[in-house]
């Protein structure tokens, strides 16, 4: 029995990146032997064990053979005779098929992963890559993380991904798996690379048709020098990741904010009146299909509906600002206003030439919200108030607080 460190921990160490969890592969053992050493079995589909002291995952070396459609149809062989090289061959990309012998720090790299790391190439290991459609989304997710380091996908890997899409392999993916890859990509520094990669291999229209529909829809060049709405969406996603690193909730809201532009009648192009209202239905549809968590869905709908109001905040009456806060449920969920402000700033800055622009509307919205939030029912003279009168008096007090919080000379945001 011998164990090797494999996968992401080895890859990230070679890239000089912070390593995540350590995963190990065990050669020459069977489940009974692992249990006798105190390892706890946790794998459902194949033999995986937790180390009795460290809690790290140790998986028996295995091979996988396709015997059905989709990503679930595999026969797993975890016999003790399976070699390390055979186990590494079943993995997706060469950079993930590097093992380290911790006893002497020797790298085992049978498929050229070290060279691909040096060349900044994401390359599949074997034709078996095409047997698992989830790997198309994994490739896109890896690009969201690795593109800032200069990585690109090998041409032959892109060709295989396109063929997988053309063969209908991605139609078997369940919504939960799509959401898992999408949400993880939103936690990385360049989520636009996820969208760009999927679109390059014609997969975006299969798994995220609402987003794919944005590409080719023009915006007014005076306000959007990038013109294409899909490109604007990519820019917004990357700015959101910069403003709120690792925040998938904000990332998803930013992703959905302009979905309504895909539904604008062509006769009104490149203008998009009412796109915030039109975007509510596709945002709801996308969220429900992918079974997105409720808090993600709610913030996405808020961002879709309210982003133009935040852009033109200086033009809104005090009572209109209060109504905006109420629609956001901002007095019970105060965190939503700061989140909305970040999404709106990402939208404003997600345009060619505006990436570093100042966005005072966001700070001002938070300031108005804080002023209104500081007023509560206990502050009222309730001696002569009854029933709904209390709520009405509280609303008026909060509107006065908003009025007293000051104004600023902001933009109108009308043409966003």
UniProtKB/Swiss-Prot annotation:
Q: Which UniProt keywords apply?
A: ATP-binding, Hydrolase, Magnesium, Metal-binding, Multifunctional enzyme, Nickel, Nucleotide-binding, Nucleotidyltransferase, RNA repair, RNA-binding, Transferase, tRNA processing
Annotated EC: 2.7.7.72, 3.1.3.-, 3.1.4.-
Which Gene3D superfamilies did the record assign?
A: Beta Polymerase, domain 2, cca-adding enzyme, domain 2
Q: How is the cofactor bound?
A: Magnesium is required for nucleotidyltransferase activity. Nickel for phosphatase activity.
Enumerate the residues binding CTP.
Answer: 8, 11, 91, 138, 141
- The HD domain sits at 229-331
Give an example GO biological process: tRNA 3'-terminal CCA addition
Miscellaneous note, as given in the UniProt record, is: A single active site specifically recognizes both ATP and CTP and is responsible for their addition.
Domain writeup: Comprises two domains: an N-terminal domain containing the nucleotidyltransferase activity and a C-terminal HD domain associated with both phosphodiesterase and phosphatase activities.
> Its quaternary structure?
Monomer. Can also form homodimers and oligomers.
What protein does this entry describe? Multifunctional CCA protein
**Native source species:** Xylella fastidiosa (strain M12)
The lineage is: Bacteria, Pseudomonadati, Pseudomonadota, Gammaproteobacteria, Lysobacterales
